[in-house]
A protein has these predicted regions:
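Short gly/ser/thr-rich secondary-structure transition/capping motifs
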Residues: 47, 83-88, 128-135
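A glycine-rich helix N-cap at a beta->alpha junction
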Residues: 42-57
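Conserved phosphate/ATP/ADP-binding segment of small-molecule kinases
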Residues: 123-171
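Glycine-rich phosphate/adenosyl-contacting loop at the front of the ribokinase-like
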Residues: 1-29, 34-38, 44-45
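Conserved phosphate-binding/catalytic loop of the ribokinase/pfkB sugar-kinase fold
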Residues: 29, 55, 65-102, 107
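Short beta->alpha connector loops
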Residues: 32-33, 108-112, 132-136
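Surface-exposed amphipathic alpha-helices with a cationic face
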Residues: 18, 115-123
Length: 171
């Protein structure tokens, strides 16, 4: 069967924070396609402020997900507008928001943007949470600016360069 829903790591995390009543802003880029207005409307319905969503030419980021008979998923990330987010604009947005206490990031945008935003956060005593999806090796300098790292089992294997077996977990 086919279903379409809103998502992306950053969007899902912002929506949950908004639904829980947190003062939540989404800093992102969306394309000039059919997903733009639907996504902005969804954020607004879920108590996520959209003042700092930039609209750029081209497609929005999408991620078709296939789930096999064993419940394992396969995700193809098509970055689209996500690749156009700019660290200077993101940091400027944080300054305009003011009094930011928490930043949540993820690897579906360019890592250099995460680097700069998380360095800004560390300099300004802002707590950071990083969801390393899609999984990739993370630079030690970047990790120094991460307060909470929340990988799933596959991402943990990639980050730690370890097979996640019972024996390795118990070591």
């Amino acid at each position: 069967s086919y279903q379409m829903g809103f998502g992306g790591k950053g969007a899902n995390q912002a929506v949950m924070a908004g639904l829980l009543g947190a003062d939540t802003y989404m800093i992102a880029c969306l394309g000039t396609d059919v997903y733009r207005d639907m996504t902005i409307d969804n954020f607004k319905e879920k108590n996520v402020k959209t003042d700092f969503i930039q609209i750029v030419d081209g497609s929005s980021g999408v991620a078709p997900i296939w789930v096999d008979g064993n419940g394992q998923n396969r995700i193809i990330v098509i970055s689209g507008a996500n690749d156009q987010i700019d660290s200077k604009k993101a940091i400027k947005s944080l300054g305009e928001i003011g009094n930011v206490s928490l930043i949540v990031g993820q690897a579906e945008i360019p890592m250099e943007v995460n680097y700069e935003v998380f360095k800004f956060a560390k300099r300004n005593n802002i707590t950071t949470i990083f969801n390393p999806a899609p999984g990739r090796l993370l630079d030690e300098q970047f990790l120094e600016n991460v307060d909470w790292l929340i990988p799933n089992e596959t991402e943990f294997e990639i980050i730690s360069n370890t097979n996640l077996t019972k024996e390795n977990i118990l070591k």
